[in-house]
Amino acid sequence: REAFKQPIGTFQANKHVMATFATELDIAQVYVDSLIAKVLDGTLSDIEASKAKWWVTELGKRVIDGCLQLHGGYGYMLEYPVAKAYIDYRYMTIGGGSTEIMKEMIGNDLGLAWRKRG
């Protein structure tokens, strides 16, 4: 896409957004790869899986939302793949346990479960 007769990717702010996304996705890939190794050797815990589901799906949601924003109004039109990705991906933070449920499980594992006294 172009704005002011130049590709939007050449604007400093947009380069910074894309650099952030690229870095965060690389870090997420390393994290997921380490967890795949644990799955393969049977040592992945429920809490590690919860942390991964929460972090990676929320990252994906931020990245897709940012890409939609970079596309401007076109990003909201279903003719563009980013709009379809935005619609399809939204389920990822809900299905299989919402982000809030993942955080609840992690918090309980940290010993922060509520206990009735008395």
Give residue ranges: language-model regions.
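Alpha-helical interface subdomain recognition
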Residues: 1-118
